[in-house]
């Protein structure tokens, strides 16, 4: 049976920010610990491996980690400087015995309504892998309020993340998730009689 963390990440990222004093000392500056089972994971700034530079961040499942939860390192930024454009989140992930490791990006509108979302659910990183670059492309509509992004681990193993970058791309670059809201909608119904 496939366990999909799509629903948990959508719901719990709004309400499950976790402050764990003993872990916060190792959390990279600017990043937040969250997730439906963040207490089941160890988060760290890691100086033993990096895609480039000296450091990466890691998420490691504890031996008794919940089979239904996940832990994430994330950031949430104001969408003011990103509206009315298509944006690409890229980053490097490396895994060791990972059940599911995934990079993710979410665009929120008013009242925390999700307007664009991709968490690589159809293309998770599993097992043991070397440093590999991944990309997510989403639209940020004019009514966007926040952009959240990060990477997570579900169930078991370790994932490292490094060199995340958010950059504007042309509208010809395809979005990576069908949940993206088109940049504009038609003003009138089209082909209502199906003759075209």
Set out the residue ranges of the language-model regions.
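Bacterial N-terminal signal peptides
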Residues: 9-21
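Extracellular and organelle-lumenal recognition/adhesion modules and their flexible linkers in secreted
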Residues: 22-196
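N-terminal secretory signal peptides that target proteins for export/translocation
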Residues: 1-6
């Amino acid at each position: 049976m496939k366990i999909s963390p799509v629903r948990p990440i959508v719901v719990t990222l709004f309400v499950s920010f976790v402050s764990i004093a003993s872990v916060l000392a190792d959390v990279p500056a600017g990043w937040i610990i969250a997730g439906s089972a963040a207490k089941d994971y160890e988060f760290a700034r890691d100086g033993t491996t990096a895609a480039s530079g000296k450091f990466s961040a890691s998420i490691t499942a504890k031996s008794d980690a919940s089979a239904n939860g996940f832990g994430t390192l994330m950031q949430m930024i104001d969408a003011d400087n990103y509206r009315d454009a298509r944006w690409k989140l890229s980053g490097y992930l490396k895994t060791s015995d990972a059940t599911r490791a995934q990079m993710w990006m979410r665009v929120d509108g008013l009242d925390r309504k999700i307007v664009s979302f991709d968490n690589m659910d159809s293309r998770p990183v599993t097992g043991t892998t070397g440093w590999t670059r991944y990309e997510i492309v989403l639209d940020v509509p004019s009514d966007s309020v926040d952009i959240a992004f990060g990477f997570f681990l579900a169930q078991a193993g370790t994932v490292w993340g490094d060199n995340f970058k958010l950059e504007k791309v042309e509208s010809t670059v395809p979005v990576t998730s069908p949940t993206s809201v088109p940049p504009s909608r038609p003003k009138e119904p089209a082909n209502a009689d199906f003759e075209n």
